[in-house]
Amino acid sequence: MNKWVRFSLAFVVLLISLIATAQEQGVVKPQLLLSEIMQGMPKGERQEVRVLTASFKPGDQTVFHTHRFPVTVYILEGAFTLEMEGREPVTVKAGQAMVEPPHVRMTGHNRSSTEPLQVVIFYVSDPDTPFLDRIH
């Protein structure tokens, strides 16, 4: 292949990539953080969507509880450890997310002795369903 043909092909490839890049600038593409197949989602015609926040001081923990529907937790700061009955503890750190399964006895902890923990919680349920059921 002569120089002119190679140069022309290289120029066309460069031009196409520049056009594609220019079209993508300013366009936000969501990045997948977590995907899980879940059972136990609400099946009614209407659902209530709740977004909650929780702040844990070092050493704080939740009450021993269950949820009627899956709960998604996103960690803003610190590390969250979830202990579920019959399962190994799970720890997720800032920038990560996890799904708490329904109908499993659990408690969540900030195991750090120095760092706070902040989380955002997403809960989709039948309307007026309690967020958690405390285990006594």
Describe each model-derived feature in a short phrase.
Residues 1-9:
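Bacterial N-terminal signal peptides that target proteins for export
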Residues 8-17:
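Bacterial N-terminal signal peptides
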Residues 20-24:
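Boundary at the C-terminal end of the N-terminal hydrophobic targeting segment
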Residues 28-63, 122:
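A short glycine-rich, His/Asp/Glu-containing loop-to-beta-strand
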Residues 56, 86-103:
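Short acidic-glycine-tyrosine-enriched beta hairpin
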Residues 61-63, 81, 98, 102-109, ...:
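Histidine-centered metal-chelating micro-motifs
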Residues 69-86, 96:
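Glycine- and acidic-residue-biased ligand/ion/polar-headgroup-sensing regions
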Residues 89, 103-128:
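Ligand-binding loop in jelly-roll beta-barrel domains
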